[in-house]
Amino acid sequence: TGDSAQYYGCITEMDEQVGRLQAKLKKLGIYDNTLQVFCSDNGPEGNDPDFGDRQAGVTGGFRGRKSSCYEGGVRVPALAVWPGQIKAGSVVNSAVCTYDYMPTIAEIMVYQMPDQRILDGENILPVIRGEADRTKSIPFRHKGRAWLVKGSYKMIINSITETKSDEIYDLSRDAYETENINAISPEL
């Protein structure tokens, strides 16, 4: 009922539309030569004054929701399908970012950016294929906070506008961000 019904209705509609797209690609004979990528919006709404009392959506137990710097607000599912290029059923546990899409597509198309333009992201096709790890850090800034993901570590910089201490989490051991290791590992 209410927000939950709308939320799950949107998921059902999205599934139907993805099915229509795939059927059309197959009908046109270009399904096997088309990279399809799907990524959801960041975090479900709720527990934030900007969104009222709406609570639809789940974080899978991750801390935080939309507008939060914690994994429940920024970790989202992404799916990539490209027959013959990406192994079906493979799982990638490396963090990537939507601004990685542009350099990845440019690489696939063998396209050189004009004027040696530098892009923030990186080509993530080797990451998706399981051939390499991400090389660049992922920086974010939102609502007076900043955070940086490098490898399995995530640093949340609260000191920009707050007096709270900064936080560091090892997401490979603590994806739910329950143990701030900043005090015990300040060298990170």
Where do the protein language model's features map onto the residues?
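Conserved catalytic motifs of the protein kinase core domain
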Residues: 33-35, 55, 75, 164-165
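Secreted, luminal/periplasmic, and some membrane-associated catalytic domains
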Residues: 23, 27, 33, 73, ...
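C-terminal cap/loop subdomain of S1 sulfatases and analogous C-terminal strand-loop tails that border
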Residues: 44-69, 85-90, 94, 98-172, ...
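Metal-dependent active-site segment of extracytoplasmic phospho-/sulfohydrolases and closely related
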Residues: 13-50
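Structural helix-adjacent loops and short alpha-helical linkers that scaffold large soluble proteins
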Residues: 26-30, 113-114, 187
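Hydrophobic/aromatic beta-strand patches that form the interior of the parallel beta-sheet core
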Residues: 35-37, 79, 169
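Active-site-proximal N-terminal segment of extracellular/periplasmic enzymes that hydrolyze or transfer
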Residues: 179-186
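The substrate-binding groove and active-site-proximal loops of carbohydrate-active enzymes
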Residues: 2-13
